[in-house]
Curated annotation (Swiss-Prot):
The keyword Signal does not apply. It comes from the Eukaryota. Keywords: Leucine-rich repeat, Repeat. GO terms for molecular function: ubiquitin-like ligase-substrate adaptor activity. LRR repeats lie at residues 15-38, 204-229, 271-294, 319-342, 391-414. Belongs to the PRAME family. One of its GO terms (biological process) is positive regulation of cell population proliferation. This is PRAME family member 14. GO terms for cellular component: Cul2-RING ubiquitin ligase complex; cytoplasm.
């Protein structure tokens, strides 16, 4: 029978302070730092809003990582803390103990709260905090430095979440005193006018990851280009299912030119993903030549590109060090793959992931990319399913992977010889051909995880992935 440990003296002292909110408020200025975190956590748990309002005004650390304590924002708690910050920001003479530079509403630092109570007496905080934060994120707090509020934002619908709407209004009313910093911003279904309102409030230089979904390309370019140009610290830029209904190729070209000029300002961009790439067909070079920083990840998926678009991929230094290249479901069967082969040769020393699934590549085109592919010594993932391959072409492809010792996940289509007149797999024939392909592969190297066959699996509907056992269910 276990005996519950008695409360520590620190815990008892904190509980005593919280019994009388007036007493705890008057004691904040002189409260030992070792008591501050347990007392704050207890006030937070009991929702003593008045105590929280005062505690934030005397916060003795450079950062208050509230998001890791409050997984889901609670409106009344947020109001109490922001009220305390408002009272503080409007004072000419701030409390001598106040060191707060950052209110972090992201779920990023659980360790901060796990270190109480004893560890705080031994730690030299905020020196330990400074190791975790960069100068860019938390500059030295001078008299006129704005308070930084960090949050990741996902705009899904209108009306917005109550907490987010309140926070936006609070920051807007304190322009110059507060910077709303958003390292990750995702826009799903919010109308463009509401997204623009949000961008007017957010400190644009803080955005490192931006994802925009389901918008019209012409409206996006006309309405958001001026904001994108100011996101100078952007690392990841994703456009998913942005559409267009234009038939004027000349007008499309002018819009792409305007849009491409944005990339002249994005000197830290590492990932560019465009799902539904057809809008850039015939104009892709305008975008690629404006890229300022060598990309690590390029994803141009779903749609079609012209041969001139493919040629430009190997001609600019910004794509010379790619680690991840995804061209899935870009229809390539009508164009020469020599430009793609040239790109693979160029990035062979760095490429780790290559996804060419669903490109409808014909076996007659395959020879153009095999030399480049065979030199990709760092390749760990290769998706090549849903392409039209003969048995001979697949054997040739597998033999050209003999030097790719780091390959740990690879997928290939069923050979066309295993398909019947209805273009469906004849499983009896397929089993024999698959065994022959595996025998060919094992003669040159030992595969780790490999999937050969139609995707998704006709039995269970699954597609191969990192989480899926790579075998046919049938």
């Amino acid at each position: 029978m276990s005996i519950q440990a008695p409360p520590r003296l620190l815990e008892l002292a904190g509980q005593s302070l919280l019994r009388d909110q007036a007493l705890s408020i008057s004691a904040m200025e002189e409260l030992p730092r070792v008591l501050y975190l347990p007392l704050f956590m207890e006030a937070f748990r009991r929702r003593h809003f008045q105590t929280l309002t005062v505690m934030v005004q005397a916060w003795p650390f450079t950062c208050l990582p509230l998001g890791s304590l409050m997984k889901t924002l609670h409106l009344e708690t947020l109001k109490a803390l922001l009220e305390g910050l408002h009272m503080l920001l409007t004072q000419k003479d701030r409390p001598r103990r106040w060191k707060l530079q950052v209110l972090d509403l992201r779920d990023v630092d659980e360790n901060f709260w796990a270190r109480w109570p004893g560890a705080w007496a031994l730690s030299c905080f905020p020196e330990t905090m400074s190791k975790r934060q960069t100068a860019e994120d938390c500059p030295r707090m001078g008299e006129h430095q704005p308070l930084k509020v960090f949050i990741d934002i996902c705009l899904k619908e209108i009306p917005q979440d109550e907490c987010l709407r309140y926070l936006f209004q609070w920051v807007y009313q304190r322009r110059g005193l507060v910077h709303l910093c958003c390292s990750k911003l995702v826009n799903y279904l919010t109308p463009i006018k509401h997204l623009r309102k949000s961008l007017k409030i957010i400190y644009l230089n803080s955005i490192q990851q931006l994802e925009i979904r389901n918008m019209s390309w012409p409206r996006l370019i006309r309405k958001l280009r001026c904001y994108l140009k100011e996101m100078k610290n952007l690392r990841k830029l994703v456009f998913s299912r942005c559409h267009h209904s234009m038939s004027d190729n000349e007008l499309e070209g002018r819009l792409v030119t305007k849009f491409s000029s944005v990339f002249l300002r994005l000197e830290h961009l590492q990932l560019l993903k465009i799902k539904l790439i057809t809008f850039f067909s015939g104009h892709l070079e305008q975008l690629i030549r404006c890229l300022q920083n060598p990309l690590e990840n390029l994803e141009l998926t779903y749609g079609y590109l012209l041969e001139e678009d493919m040629k430009c991929l190997s001609q600019y230094p910004s794509l010379g060090y790619l680690k991840h290249l995804n061209l899935s479901y870009v229809l390539l069967f009508r164009i020469s793959l020599e430009p793609l082969g040239a790109l693979l040769e160029k990035i062979a020393a760095s490429l780790e992931t290559l996804i060419l699934e669903g490109c409808q590549i014909h076996y007659s085109q395959l020879s153009a990319i095999l030399p480049g592919l065979s030199h990709c010594s760092q390749l760990t993932t290769f998706y090549f399913g849903r392409n039209c391959m003969s048995m001979g072409a697949l054997k040739d492809l597998l033999c050209h992977t003999s030097g790719l010792s780091k390959l740990s996940l690879e997928t290939y289509p069923a050979p066309e010889e295993s398909l019947n007149s209805l273009v469906r797999v004849d499983w009896e024939i397929f089993a024999l051909l698959r065994a022959e392909l595996m025998c060919t592969l094992r003669e040159v190297r030992q595969p780790k995880r490999i999937f050969i066959g139609p995707t998704p699996c006709p039995s269970c509907g699954s597609s191969p992935s990192e989480e899926l056992e790579l075998h046919l269910c049938c």
